[in-house]
Amino acid sequence: MSETANSRTTERKQDHIEICLHGDVVFNGKTTGFERFAFEHAALPEISFSDIDLSTSFLGKSIGAPLMISSMTGGYSEAATLNQRLAEAAERFGIPLGVGSMRQALENRSYRESFAVVRKYAPTVQIFANIGAPEVAKGLTESEINTMLELLRADGLIVHLNAAQELFQPEGNTDFRHVLEQLALLSAKIPVPVLVKEVGCGISASAARQLIAAGVKAIDVAGAGGISWQKVEEIRYTRQFGQERRFSLQALDELLNWGIPTAQCLIDIGALKKESPGLNGIEIVASGGVGSGMDVAKSLALGAQLAASARALLKALHDGVLEETITSWLNDLRAVMFLTGTATIAELRHKTLITKP
């Protein structure tokens, strides 16, 4: 990659962080759907609060709590500091961490340290590498795969599906042909599990079925209700070119708020798994607008193995309260478990949610 192209990629990654922290990038008129549900109160919990156990497992490995610090950043100098602090928090709580897209690490060695720092400060927890669907569609070489995995000593590879983001991105790649074909090839030859995640538009049951058939081991629904990457890229576009001229004003609002709410994704994929018992080995991650331990708890009751968050934790990191925020979320989760009489995460997953009137 040329020096100019590297500079543009670095600028884009910096823009993403700045806009996510300070821009108006949440969905309008569309929520995660978690607010539609409530837990039934257990007047007789029959457990001690001190006995509540948040530990669980993900992809065969024990984790301290059903929470993942979701893919955010990497590939520019300032990202090393952000990733170090995220890694330190992940290690403290014993929870998984996903890095941002590693495309730039493949194209320029000078940016690899911003990713490698993660394993240095999180030596014992699950770390997930990350690459975009357009890169997968072109066919990753064995060298590229090895570079990503070895750089992090990764426990898995996340492939992110971001068609809507690429559509709005000024320099976006909208060629999504052969993604499934290449995913199947990748899943068959890679020595660690492949996870597939959206980035805020959600994964439907039909898409989940296709992904499972391609051999992925986990699906992160990353539904609508939190950050809209269309809005992030729209801000970048208008900064560069002024008024939006690509889409009609009549359609723009719906396109910017395009996506399936997170809770609906979980419900639909949960129904798919019930219809097809052979799919029960696939683990589901709930992300997209997760902003508290209550959201984590509802995610688990809706069928997720764990929940994940990016923007809320990034903002907490920016404000200097990352570990305090994670602690409060885990306390939220313990509170829900106590008030529903569930001592373990496995028990919480079997709780039935009440639909609010």
Swiss-Prot record:
* Residues reported in the UniProt entry to bind Mg(2+): E166
Question: Which positions bind FMN?
Answer: S70, S71, M72, T73, S101, N130, K197, A310, R311
* GO terms, molecular function: FMN binding; isopentenyl-diphosphate delta-isomerase activity; magnesium ion binding; NADPH binding; oxidoreductase activity
Reactions catalysed, semicolon-separated, are: isopentenyl diphosphate = dimethylallyl diphosphate
Q: Which Gene3D superfamilies match?
A: Aldolase class I
The record, for CDD domains, names: IDI-2_FMN
Q: Which UniProt keywords apply?
A: Cytoplasm, Flavoprotein, FMN, Isomerase, Isoprene biosynthesis, Magnesium, Metal-binding, NADP
Q: What does this protein do?
A: Involved in the biosynthesis of isoprenoids. Catalyzes the 1,3-allylic rearrangement of the homoallylic substrate isopentenyl (IPP) to its allylic isomer, dimethylallyl diphosphate (DMAPP).
Q: What is this protein called?
A: Isopentenyl-diphosphate delta-isomerase
**Organism name:** Pelodictyon phaeoclathratiforme (strain DSM 5477 / BU-1)
